[in-house]
Amino acid sequence: MEAIISFAGIGINYKKLQSKLQHDVGRFLRALTITARALPGQPKHIAIRQETAFTLQGEYIYFPILLRKQFEMFNMVYTAHPVSLRALPCVETEFPLFNYQQEMVDKIHKKLLSPYGRFYLHLNTGLGKTRIAISIIQKLLYPTLVIVPTKAIQIQWIDELKLLLPHLRVAAYNNAACKKKDITSKEYDVIVGIINTLRKKPEPFFEPFGLVVLDEAHELHSPENYKIFWKIQLSRILGLSATPLDRPDGMDKIILHHLGQPQRTVSPTTTFSGYVREIEYQGHPDFVKPVCINEKVSAIATIDKLLQDPSRIQLVVNETKRLYSLHTAEPQKWGTNEPYGIIIFVEFRKLLEIFYQALSEEFKDVQIIVPEVALLCGGVSNTALSQAHSASIILLTYGYGRRGISFKHMTSIIMATPRRNNMEQILGRITRQGSDEKKVRIVVDIKDTLSPLSSQVYDRHRIYKKKGYPIFKCSASYQQPYSSNEVLIWDPYNESCLASTTTPPSPSK
């Protein structure tokens, strides 16, 4: 990208000015060369060709913010180098939006047409960020690049674009597609690319796009990923996130420097009834002891040891069978239920295969007809993703599942391993806008009472209470891996409640 700094005046020492800029500005920029040129009929200009980002205290920040004082000092005006953009075909297509979505579309559209065309949308999981962004694409009619973190989200974007804007030419940009042909904005109207592939592209690849959409923008925090900001300093950038200020490592500020403060809309009125089954599990002494590395408790190693307990694996299988058997014969106050779609979350990949084998054996009779259990993780095939949309049980890692995975038929969660962070996004997997709100949402939370990780449950309680989900406690052990004796420990309608014999809906046996 070429930025032009214009100046006019009498008696300006051009060489001194050039030297001053090189000293004061160049020390912040990763790459900077200043060349003089004269434009016919115009005052002299200084052209700065650079990577459009500078380094300051280890952070990468949108450069005009820092340079503004330099411009004011020399009475300069910053203007972006003009780029000629082709217009997308204009076809009258309409797709329904909720009122809150339409209000946000109007607000984003106005902001993106302003000189500093950046908008950071904060909208809770499942409330239609993708649909809002597609509406913006339709209104602006510029070649658009959508940057996503995973293949699953890429496929969801492409499916949604083809459904809502069928007249546009849409392409997936990944390593496999690029080996077959060169995918550019000349051949396609919207390109949906995975960050790991796009960050390797040179800056000229990005210049023909009139809009960049960053889905799951809070994920662009790693030293490799946020270098993409050096290359996409275009006129219009839209960031999307359900949790823009929720990173425990404090790296949110990196994204805020580029996109500005997140803007959120009024929450919709749709609510989902649900409850939490908190199982206090007393594991075998051989598996609950903390694992220390360098004299500190290692959460990952401790979780790995917890899941070596065969009774704990059986507990998850039993809870899955319990949810799988739920039907409509439940008290009216809990809504109308049908067989549940179940998501099982684990901490890391090798545990997925352990649970997959256990569940596949348990459900082998029904899997003859249709795969009931699906396993999703990084590098998953398109076939596996397609099968997951019809599976009743999906196995995910927390890291993979928190990133915008959309399965509207999923209504319950089993947290097979302890978790503290990203709970808003995890619960959002079963509270997506447009799914059946009549179905009761159920969260099964296993608390390892003898493990040092048991205290994490109180962080999860905070999110459950925010959702208004009653919390029922029950118990199980390595000697008896079947949960029983539910006791209500928190009621949103009676917050002083500490314990009660009230029980949640009982599954059919």
From Swiss-Prot:
GO terms for molecular function: ATP binding; ATP hydrolysis activity; DNA binding; RNA helicase activity. InterPro entries: Helicase/UvrB_N, Helicase_ATP-bd, Helicase_Restrict-Modif_Enz, P-loop_NTPase. ATP binds at residues 123-130. This is Putative ATP-dependent RNA helicase QP509L. Residues 110-262 form the Helicase ATP-binding domain. It catalyses: ATP + H2O = ADP + phosphate + H(+). SUPFAM superfamilies: P-loop containing nucleoside triphosphate hydrolases.
